[in-house]
Curated annotation (Swiss-Prot):
GO terms for molecular function: calcium ion binding. It comes from Mus musculus (Mouse). Belongs to the nephronectin family. This is Epidermal growth factor-like protein 6. Residues 397-543 form the MAM domain.
Length: 550
């Protein structure tokens, strides 16, 4: 029943005369009350709970989740299309399983529908019944036949099937291989007999987010489903993960082993070690009567190592702080003097050389047989030889990986890290990339952070490098300032020996923030890419500079 005009007129006047209200929704006209989903709130008309206004101003129902194969007719209420059922119309109805059966002979359920087929010797009629047909009996179809204008022929129950060459057997159509399947970019196609479906890529899972289903990344690290070693850190990536060994461990991340640490003090105090043999050799000096030519070289036992606990490089923190060379060298000399005093006891050795038979206490003659028994190795470090050649140069930065005042940093955005390796003479370390690190074309970067350089017109960068092994990879050097400029590259080293590279850096180098050593893995399985002592010299590179090989 319509309200009296006396009541309706005051409600209409503001809208007609251009008042604040501009829509009949704000004044509860009775005509709106007959629309579905419209409710009266006091003197106003608005969409009921569970309904919302569309762009045409009509209230429409809301369903969450949406009706997949149907329409929303009320709040969270779906009306399914024929062939589908369920709360959100996602379940297929098996028409072949209901009673009465829709087909006389064979019934094949399809997605959202069904198809009828007749036994051999029968023909399918429009009303889904079958009639005898001698022609169909001769065809001997796999799934049945149908009557066409050209005559009876075999049919397949799905659009994902096709008739074989004999015209009787149905073969599967691989929609994934034929590009007929349409899957989102983050899903992959899986073929089935007569159809296909879309599945999330490996490392992703299907979730309902933002009113739709989507494939999201699986965080294997958070779910603890990764195979990383207990001594490795798990780093989640899109669709996968990475394993990196923790500080103090080495390996591929799946298997990590402790980096061995050998103490110099333990070696010297072990029973029957080289300490006793040195005393024996010193006692033998009085028996020598032949004049010998002395070589002023300090021997080191091959088994003695610099303790790795003092290695200034930290793979966990990514940054290496250089140590004070003078302070540590002073401590080593004091420790050496204390050990010599313990060995001498109350005896004192004359620190002078007698031409006929007396040797200094800290020098050994190569003609003494006991020297071979001691298995002594005379240390000739290539780094020292290299620096002797540059002793007259103005060195601005002098860096190595065991001594020196400089900062080294691993790149956290690359594919693998550089690792410290023992030098051949067991004294100190250099940085290397083994051939088994990473995969082909993977990149590992090592940065040398430069301090505030004194402005100069030119600089020369000197460094020792080695590419050992067949097809081990490439070594590049970048100079980082406003942009990363490739300054040097080496792809192979035929003999695999240590060499020294030099790069002339011209005016403007004082604005450089770092020098980057980049290793790119090849397909070789043996060898390594290595870098050692780095020098930054003020001025031009010397013309008489010779590469140091070792």
């Amino acid at each position: 029943m319509q309200p009296p005009w006396g009541l309706a007129l005051p409600l209409l006047l503001p809208w007609v005369t251009g008042g604040v209200g501009t829509s009949p929704w704000d004044y509860g006209l009775s005509a709106l009350a007959h629309q579905p989903g419209v409710c009266q709130y006091g003197t106003k008309m608005a969409c009921c709970y569970g309904w919302k206004r569309n762009n045409k101003g009509v209230c429409e129902a809301m369903c969450e989740p949406r009706c997949k194969f149907g329409e929303c007719v009320g709040p969270n209420k779906c009306r399914c299309f024929p062939g589908y059922t369920g709360k959100t119309c996602t379940q297929d109805v098996n028409e072949c399983g209901v009673k009465p059966r829709p087909c006389q002979h064979r019934c094949v359920n399809t997605h959202g529908s069904y198809k009828c087929f007749c036994l051999s010797g029968h023909m399918l009629l429009p009303d889904a019944t079958c009639s005898n047909s001698r022609t169909c009996a001769r065809l001997n179809c796999q799934y049945g036949c149908e009557d066409t204008e050209e005559g009876p022929r075999c049919v397949c129950p799905s659009s994902g099937l096709r008739l074989g060459p004999n015209g009787r057997v149905c073969l599967d159509i691989d929609e994934c291989a034929s590009s007929k399947a349409v899957c989102p970019s983050n899903r992959r196609c899986v073929n089935t007999f007569g159809s296909y479906y879309c599945k999330c890529h490996i490392g992703f899972e299907l979730k309902y987010i933002g009113r739709r289903y989507d494939c999201v990344d699986i965080n294997e690290c958070a779910l603890n489903t990764h195979p990383c070693s207990p001594h490795a850190n798990c780093l989640n990536t899109r669709g996968s993960f990475k394993c990196k060994c923790k500080q103090g461990y080495r390996g591929n991340g799946l298997q990590c082993s402790v980096i061995p640490e050998h103490s110099v003090k333990e070696i010297l105090t072990a029973p029957g070690t080289i300490k006793d043999r040195i005393k024996k050799l010193l006692a033998h000096k009085r028996t020598m009567k032949k004049k010998v030519k002395l070589k002023m070289v300090t021997p080191r036992p091959a088994s003695t190592r610099v303790p790795k606990v003092n290695l200034p490089y930290s793979s966990e923190e990514g940054v290496s702080r250089g140590r004070n060379y003078d302070g540590e060298q002073k401590k080593k000399e004091e420790g050496k003097r204390e050990r010599l005093e313990e060995e001498k006891g109350e005896k004192t050795l004359r620190n002078e050389v007698e031409q006929e038979r007396t040797l200094r206490g800290d020098v050994f003659s190569p003609k003494v047989n006991e020297a071979e028994d001691l298995d002594l190795v005379y240390v000739q470090r290539k780094e020292l030889n290299s620096k002797l050649k540059h002793k007259d140069l103005n060195i601005s930065v002098d860096c190595s990986f065991d001594l020196g005042v400089c900062d080294w940093k691993q790149d956290r955005e690359d594919d693998f890290d550089w690792h410290p390796a023992d030098r051949d003479n067991d004294v100190g370390y250099y940085m290397a990339v083994p051939a088994l690190a990473g995969h082909k074309k993977n990149i590992g970067r090592l940065k040398l952070l430069l301090p505030n350089l004194t402005p100069q017109s030119n600089f020369c960068l000197l460094f020792d490098y080695r590419l050992a092994g067949d097809k081990v990879g490439k070594l590049r050097v970048f100079v980082k300032n406003s942009n990363n400029a490739l300054a040097w590259e080496e792809t192979k080293n035929e003999d695999g020996r240590w060499r020294t590279g030099k790069i002339q850096l011209y005016q403007g180098i004082d604005t450089t923030k770092s020098v980057i050593f980049e290793a790119e893995r090849g397909k070789g399985k043996t060898g390594e890419i290595a870098v050692d002592g780095v020098l930054l010299v003020s001025g031009l590179c010397p013309d008489d500079f010779l590469s140091v090989e070792g």
